[in-house]
Amino acid sequence: MRLSTMLELAVERDPRAIAIVDGDRRWSYADWYARVEQLARALRASGVGPGDRVVLCLRNREETAALHLACQRVDAITTPLNFRLASGEIAYCIGDAAPRLVVYEDCTAQAVLAGRAQWGCRPELVAVDAPVPPGGIAFDALLARGDSAPSLPPIPADADDRLIGLILYTSGTTGRPKGVPRSQRAEYAAAVAHALQNRY
């Protein structure tokens, strides 16, 4: 099973229940599912597909969670980076991941953009509540790409959950950070274990 399937099941169970709260912003499961689906269509319209990496230089916020589920929906690979990393560390990880998109916010903009010359790749830049550089777009503009994009097919019951859904970079204590892949199945199991442990 996949995390994105869990969201679909939550919508079926109680669509009006609150799914996520970020400051003064709230979404019901039904509303958030629609937003994640729109974002998944937007990713597909942006050329993001199976196996593509999407680097997130974001704090814990709604956009982070929505992007993670949207990436899984199109079989792309979420690659979150610690927002406290220095510019050189971020540049190395982006160069190593070779992502299709790099998503950042105001608190990470300087560190992300300062190392662009070192990346060795040219991902599209997506700014969340941050200045948009030449050639980049705002998150809301990315989301709007999903408005007219075709609907995605339902996730088949036998969808391969062994696909890589996440790459986490190690701290690099013995050298350069290394990208550690995690399958969609492992992410689902971790979410279930977390829910059981914390009695959600």
Give the positions of each predicted feature.
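Conserved structural elements of the adenylate-forming
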Residues: 33-38, 180-200
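Conserved AMP-binding A3 loop
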Residues: 28-30, 165-189
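Solvent-exposed alpha-helix faces
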Residues: 37-41, 95, 107, 175, ...
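Conserved AMP-binding/adenylate-forming core of the ANL superfamily
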Residues: 3, 8, 16-61, 65-69, ...
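Conserved pre-ATP/AMP-binding loop-to-beta segment of ANL
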Residues: 15, 132, 147-169, 176, ...
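Conserved S/T- and glycine-rich ATP-binding loop of Class I adenylate-forming
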Residues: 54, 71, 102, 164, ...
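Short hydrophobic alpha-helical segments of the AMP-binding
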Residues: 64-72, 78, 187
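Structural core segment of the AMP-binding/adenylate-forming
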Residues: 45-46, 73-144
